[in-house]
């Protein structure tokens, strides 16, 4: 378990985890990925709190700094995956052509727009969260729910897209029970994030459900999942949860 968690940090963050202490990327590492989300969410929440202290309550700049820390801590690979996935979904042609577009490395119009929307929505939503522990919990929930969505994308029965090295190592590795346990845990964690006790859990479930539909569409379009699809699942879910938690 320790090796899997270390592997999850090595895979999902810039932390210099010693190679000898990590498990090989696969089922165990992916199962531990939401644990990385908890830590990243706590760091982002601390930055949001510090920014709110420095710039005033509900400062958009504080929200932007929290998002920036997440981007730095993850090497921006998830937001890059969102951009590539949106570009792939936005092109015409066979799955092979869509995959070539995704592997091109440059962001198209759709991909660039998706980055702006995701970063902007997360920034504003984080800044609108209530102060104190409720707001901190909200950030942790949003970031962790994104990693639970990655497990949904790797659940049993989901294939890897042709030629995807990362997809081939993690696709279909997560049993439904693992996904449900993590989903229930994050939904329970979301209870104190809002004044209405049902709003947080409902937001998490709806967001993860929406991402499951996105993953299904990606499987139809690309023939399976790729590392970019995992990044898209993480960013979409994080964004939807953050926005859902600030609905009045």
UniProtKB/Swiss-Prot annotation:
Its cofactor is Mg(2+). It is an enzyme of class 2 (transferase). It is a multi-pass membrane protein. GO terms for molecular function: adenosylcobinamide-GDP ribazoletransferase activity; cobalamin 5'-phosphate synthase activity. The chain crosses the membrane at residues 1-21, 35-55, 59-79, 101-121, 123-143, 171-191, 197-217, 227-247. Pathway: Cofactor biosynthesis; adenosylcobalamin biosynthesis; adenosylcobalamin from cob(II)yrinate a,c-diamide: step 7/7. One of its GO terms (cellular component) is plasma membrane. Pfam families: CobS. Its EC number is 2.7.8.26. Keywords: Cell membrane, Cobalamin biosynthesis, Magnesium, Membrane, Transferase, Transmembrane, Transmembrane helix. The keyword rRNA-binding does not apply. It is found in: Cell membrane. It catalyses: alpha-ribazole + adenosylcob(III)inamide-GDP = adenosylcob(III)alamin + GMP + H(+); alpha-ribazole 5'-phosphate + adenosylcob(III)inamide-GDP = adenosylcob(III)alamin 5'-phosphate + GMP + H(+). One of its GO terms (biological process) is cobalamin biosynthetic process. Joins adenosylcobinamide-GDP and alpha-ribazole to generate adenosylcobalamin (Ado-cobalamin). Also synthesizes adenosylcobalamin 5'-phosphate from adenosylcobinamide-GDP and alpha-ribazole 5'-phosphate. Belongs to the CobS family. This is Adenosylcobinamide-GDP ribazoletransferase. It comes from Mycobacterium sp. (strain KMS).
């Amino acid at each position: 378990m320790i090796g899997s968690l270390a592997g999850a940090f090595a895979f999902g963050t810039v932390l210099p985890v010693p190679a000898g202490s990590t498990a090989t990327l696969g089922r165990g590492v992916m199962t531990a990925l939401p644990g990385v989300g908890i830590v990243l969410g706590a760091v982002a929440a601390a930055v949001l709190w510090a920014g709110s202290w420095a710039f005033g309550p509900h400062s958009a700049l504080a929200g932007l700094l929290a998002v920036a820390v997440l981007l730095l801590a993850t090497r921006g690979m998830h937001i890059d995956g969102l951009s590539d996935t949106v570009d792939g979904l936005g092109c015409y042609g066979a799955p092979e052509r869509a995959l070539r577009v995704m592997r091109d490395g440059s962001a198209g119009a759709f991909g660039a727009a998706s980055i702006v929307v995701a970063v902007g929505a997360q920034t504003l939503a984080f800044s609108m969260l209530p102060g104190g522990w409720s707001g901190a919990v909200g950030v942790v929930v949003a970031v962790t729910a994104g990693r639970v969505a990655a497990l949904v994308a790797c659940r049993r029965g989901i294939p890897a897209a042709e030629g995807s090295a990362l997809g081939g190592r993690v696709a279909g590795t997560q049993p439904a029970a693992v996904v449900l346990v993590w989903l229930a845990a994050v939904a329970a964690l979301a209870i104190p994030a809002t004044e209405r006790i049902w709003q947080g859990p409902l937001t998490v479930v709806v967001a993860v459900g929406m991402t499951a539909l996105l993953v299904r569409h990606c499987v139809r379009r690309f023939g399976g999942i790729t590392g970019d699809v995992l990044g898209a699942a993480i960013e979409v879910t994080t964004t939807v949860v953050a926005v859902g938690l600030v609905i009045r």
